[in-house]
Amino acid sequence: MMPRRFPVAVDVPGLATRTALQHRRAWFQIGFFVLFVLAPPLDLFRLDLTRGHFILFGQDWTLGLAAFQQGLIGPLEAAWNLVWRGFVPLAVLVAAFIWVSWRYGRLYCGWLCPHFSVVELINGLMRRANGRPSVWERRPLPPQQPDGRVVYPNRWYWIPTVLGVLAFAFLWALTLLTYLLPPFEIYHNTLTGGLTRNQGLFLSVGTLLLAIEFGFARHLFCRFACAVGLFQSLAWMGNDRAMVVGFDTGRAAACRDCNNACDNACPMRLQPRTLKRKMFTCTECAECISACTQVQARVGRSTLLRWVEGDRALPVVTGRPAAQAPGRSPAPTTQPDA
């Protein structure tokens, strides 16, 4: 047997370690994370507390109340400014966000959210360190990966894991501070050691709290504390025909030779082969779909998990097979695990 400190890989000809879908999702995540960090210094979007208003695409975004206070406009024009500059943009943004969530679920979380990107990265590092994606995982996950590689835990990976937690905590705290105060002032003060007392306090406390969250509570935050994720899930649960991961129960016997790769791959620690109500916090990251695709490809079969929507999504909600229309092949159905 190979020593446990060394990763052991079993090559599978023609099978990549990541599917094309996951490569595409990774590029979306990287792009949005870069945008998240660079938006303040590029004046794309931030709240400047020194000016007392938002900055959007380099322009001051105010509600026009200063002109009313100076007597330059009347009450009606001031009310119109509130509606046009404040309520309408916010309503359009919220409506669009809720519609996407109602139709596709927590797509923002799985494909864009800069916090979830860190969650997945720390999960991967921690799994390489001790075989568990979280300190709260009861037992180590199987060393065999969906693509056939066998990777054993290596304690040396605790070093990049801890460094990653601290680095991303600091980067997040620094970035959040640039959303509130002039970015170049913050970056200059950080590099030269000239942070003010309040700036240093924000950065220190923010880094500490985020390090604790990234290290010990990142999944708990996504599942129970994130308001953005919660509202997406609520909108998604209100639509029985929304896009959801469906399991082909007609071929469930094919799972016998698998080590629950779909469950092991889920960053949110969910079980994809179950009812929708038990997948309330699913981020539509499709890691489970990719894992099943790779496992089945190794034996020349198609995946048992795939995205379904419309009438094909109803079995995932009810647990009952969908009624088959004449001349149509049966749709993949989902039923609760025994």
Listing of model-derived features with the role each one plays in the protein:
Residues M1-V244, I289, R306-A338:
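Membrane-embedded alpha-helical bundles of multi-pass integral membrane proteins
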Residues G105-C109, R218-C222, R251, C258, ...:
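Short metal-coordination and nucleic-acid-contact micro-motifs, chiefly zinc-binding Cys/His arrays
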Residues V228, C282-C285:
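Hydrophobic core positions of alpha-helical segments in small-molecule transporters
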